[in-house]
């Protein structure tokens, strides 16, 4: 099972709102997910990102790969840096 951390759209037409979820890569974008680990609202200025850092790091250490957009959001929040430092043992 290839696990991805990706966005799941739940907003209405012209008003996108996303959940950051852990899902099997074979599931549809808005389909079943394993766990919800955060939210992303691109309409606010500045954009609103809420992420459960512990759950995200746990899934990434277990082999979950973030999508490109989620990787950018995690970098902006400083989670990718923590993940790389933990992986290198710093």
From Swiss-Prot:
GO biological process, one term: translation
Keywords of the record: Ribonucleoprotein, Ribosomal protein
Listed GO CC annotations: cytoplasm; small ribosomal subunit
One Pfam family this sequence matches: Ribosomal_S16
Annotated InterPro entries: Ribosomal_bS16 (IPR000307), Ribosomal_bS16_dom_sf (IPR023803)
GO molecular function: structural constituent of ribosome
Family classification: Belongs to the bacterial ribosomal protein bS16 family.
Name assigned to this protein: Small ribosomal subunit protein bS16
